[in-house]
């Protein structure tokens, strides 16, 4: 079975426990194979880098097919609409073009870089969240 992340960022852990080490983060729209499940956790293997870890079962949904979109969020956060709700997908997330809201930064690279200054390191992190 193939799953897709439905939240801004999902924490991937080394073991099926909220206290386990964070090993990675899954960004909105990223897909993965479901390898194993228990009552609360799903063991997943990411499609883009084959990373394996455990995520909470409530934080993903079944994907109809493996269809990774090629539209990548380039802003620090990109508001997107999902089922009449707005969430903020972090930079690097994959989104469908029709779900994007227009954001126009004249100097986006410099602007985004300044926002990331002094961001603390997060083991296993892929965003500053």
Task: Pin down the residues of each PLM region.
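N-terminal charged segments
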Residues: 22
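SH3-family beta-barrel domains
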Residues: 1-16, 25-26, 35-38, 45, ...
